[in-house]
């Protein structure tokens, strides 16, 4: 598993450099480019699985190549920087349309967002249902802590501590188990996990843990409990 993952984007919602920010970090990224530029969050696992599909999908495809092999997209939550539904329209604009759909997976509350889009003129003039019927893509509802067979992996969504576009939505972080037994947690977006999730994770015996540090070196504050900071991993008391 370690040699099949590619980070297409590791930035927060505003990316780096942020379009409307002239802080030293953003200005440095504009000047130097390269690794200091961060596109919005997206991770590709192997040939056909992707985690999140945000607003930088066009640029990411330019940099990393065709996405025609993608068959499964695990959505962590419905914020635009992780699930940019307008990207769905790109799949219907291909000269050679797919013969099998791209499968999108969301939490139960995240799936409600899809149900709203199906009946909304905002989503391609109300044609989302029609594109589903044509087999361009399909949407699936996942329950937290239940395991599903997706592609070549066993996938278990766990409850994150981060909202989405729906009022009661909480992010889905994903535990993925490969055929060789290697187990990985893709843990973003989230704040500090709640007890239910911590209890589930106690016996998972992870080999790889991918997490976030949105707040960098800032001290973790209670009101920020939707993201994490670097001090969480380096200090026994990240709020001190």
Regions found by a protein language model. Give the residues of each.
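Structured loop/turn residues at beta-strand edges in well-structured enzyme cores
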Residues: 68, 100, 135, 153, ...
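Active-site neighborhood of divalent metal-dependent phosphoester bond hydrolases
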Residues: 98-101, 108-138
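Short, glycine/acidic-enriched loop or turn micro-motifs at the edges of active sites
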Residues: 55, 80, 191-192, 215, ...
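Metallo-beta-lactamase
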Residues: 176-228
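Active-site metal-binding motif and surrounding structural segment of the metallo-beta-lactamase
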Residues: 48, 53-105, 206-209
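Core dinuclear metal-dependent hydrolase active-site scaffold
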Residues: 1-64, 139-197
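Conserved small/polar residues in nucleotide/adenosyl-binding loops
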Residues: 233-240
